[in-house]
Amino acid sequence: LLVFAVPYGLGAGAIDAALNNYVALHYKAKHMSWLHSFWGVGTIVSPFIMGYALTNKTWNSGCRIVGALQLVIAILLLVTLPVWKVNKVTEETEKKSVGLVGALKIKGVPFLLTGFFAYCAAETTAMQWASTYFVEVKGISAERAATFASLFYIGITVGRFISGFITDKLGDRRMIITGTAILLCGICCLFVPMNSYFLAAAAFVIIGLGCATIYPCIIHSTPNNFGAENSGAIIGIQMASAYVGSTFIPPLFGLLGNAVSFKIMPFYLIFFFVLMITMTELTFRITAKN
């Protein structure tokens, strides 16, 4: 499993960067929101697939089912390759890319990467530690905690689907600000000193709704902020910064939670979300001047 995880991760990262760049260049913001909405559908469906495998077969049967689904997707992509062809002007523009090193030297890119890192760090922390928060802080059973934690995924999935209908009217920047305001309201609900877990459950739904607009809008705004010729390289680095944040920051929260208390979750989340909106706003201001 460890050996196969390496090429699996390489392939997933390549698809993530390439697909996001393609949609950012050739489609509207609403399409980007709906694309990432179906990521949420996958996160909701996947536990049922593994649950079916564990109940009726073995755990590795779940991996086979997912592998078969991905093989079908790969075949569909190969069959529909002619549909993905772009016009020559766009092809020439993409060939002029400055590359990874050159992209890092563009004004505003370091701020963008820091903001994206902070967002993915906070989002993944909320995803992975919500159930533990309910158990350790609210004192409910692990089974019920897992159910309440899934509300975050529902919030982010529904939010991205709904935002697709309004994002073209408001624009990427306003959607990012709106999403940040919503998720901060959700975090404020976690600060309310109530023993009832219903408010905490509602808080994670609100945080998910707020997160819904941020990831797709940051990516979709990249070609407009830095130029289509640079978007491929920049979005690739964005994905790398996203993976760094989602890989290392949630375990850090686990260490802090065990050492101090899992009650620090709202403080932890608000730190990274404030860092995210600060860096993102700096990016938009710098690129607006340029």
Task: Indicate residue ranges for each PLM-predicted region.
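Cytoplasmic helix-loop-helix junction between adjacent transmembrane helices
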Residues: F4-F38
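C-terminal transmembrane helical hairpin of 12-TM major facilitator-type secondary transporters
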Residues: L170-I218
